[in-house]
């Protein structure tokens, strides 16, 4: 299987966890997009009933228009049964780096509230330790971004403000904030680093998702591999 086939395979495998009367948290990214498409097809064919998706606000309108998945906002639900999302890195203890799509704050809120959090990745996202390949996205208040860059130097991080593609200026999140991408030498204690980064004044949230994933479905050339905490 090539990478796209791996993504499709894990997206289909995640459908096995869907049952009637579920509220499903939905993230962003290309692999999650396949899952959302397949979930919409299941609903359309009547294979499951009374399914509602809860995506980050920036995705709500697009989901209603494109997928056929009924959508609710986070404040309209009392609980989320399952959340399904991708990741940029997954370490051996199922800690994650997420946030290349700049929706990390709302994704973390949704996934923290979920009864079960299922992560969909291809095998290239598996790493020996976090920050092996990808930086940690950090959502920051715009007025504080320069001060936070200086603060991150204490951690020996190579950090930079994420700039927009096909637009002038920095990337702006759905919350009106900026994103700093911080590449640390390595992260040996993800939970401690996640907490410590969030204590920096001006940081809204960061892309370390420690001790939150329950199941990781990994697309490999041989098929889908299931990892559990």
Swiss-Prot record:
Listed EC numbers: 5.3.1.6
GO molecular function, one term: ribose-5-phosphate isomerase activity
Keyword Isomerase attributed: yes
Enzyme class (EC, first level): isomerase
Gene Ontology CC entries for this record: cytosol
UniProtKB keywords: Isomerase
Pathway assignment: Carbohydrate degradation; pentose phosphate pathway; D-ribose 5-phosphate from D-ribulose 5-phosphate (non-oxidative stage): step 1/1
Residues reported in the UniProt entry to bind substrate: 28-31, 85-88, 98-101, 125
InterPro entries listed in its UniProt record: NagB/RpiA_transferase-like, Ribose5P_isomerase_typA_subgr, Ribose5P_isomerase_type_A
Catalytic activity: aldehydo-D-ribose 5-phosphate = D-ribulose 5-phosphate
Gene Ontology annotations of biological process type: D-ribose metabolic process; pentose-phosphate shunt, non-oxidative branch
Active site: 107 (proton acceptor)
Family under the similarity heading: Belongs to the ribose 5-phosphate isomerase family.
NCBIfam families according to UniProt: PRK00702.1, rpiA
Subunit: Homodimer.
Stated role: Catalyzes the reversible conversion of ribose-5-phosphate to ribulose 5-phosphate.
The protein, known as: Ribose-5-phosphate isomerase A
Organism: Pyrococcus furiosus (strain ATCC 43587 / DSM 3638 / JCM 8422 / Vc1)
């Amino acid at each position: 299987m090539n990478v796209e086939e791996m993504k499709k395979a894990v997206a289909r495998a995640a459908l096995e966890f869907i049952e009637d009367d579920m509220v499903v948290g939905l993230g962003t990214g290309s692999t999650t997009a396949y899952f959302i498409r397949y979930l919409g097809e299941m609903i359309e064919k009547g294979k499951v009933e009374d399914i509602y998706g809860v995506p980050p606000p920036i995705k709500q309108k697009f989901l209603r228009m494109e997928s056929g998945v009924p959508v609710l906002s986070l404040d309209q639900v009392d609980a989320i049964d399952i959340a399904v999302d991708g990741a940029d890195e997954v370490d051996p203890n199922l800690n994650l780096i997420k946030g290349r799509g700049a929706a990390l704050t709302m994704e973390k809120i949704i996934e923290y509230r979920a009864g079960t959090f299922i992560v969909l990745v291809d095998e290239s996202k598996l790493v020996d330790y976090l920050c092996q390949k990808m930086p940690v996205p950090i959502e920051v208040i715009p007025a504080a971004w320069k001060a936070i860059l200086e603060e991150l130097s204490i951690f020996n991080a190579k950090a930079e403000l994420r700039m927009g593609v096909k637009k002038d200026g920095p990337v702006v999140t759905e919350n009106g904030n900026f994103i700093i991408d911080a590449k640390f030498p390595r992260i040996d204690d993800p939970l401690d680093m996640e907490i410590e980064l969030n204590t920096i004044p001006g940081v809204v949230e960061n892309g370390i998702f420690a001790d939150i994933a329950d199941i990781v479905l990994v697309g490999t050339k041989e098929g889908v591999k299931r990892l559990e905490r």
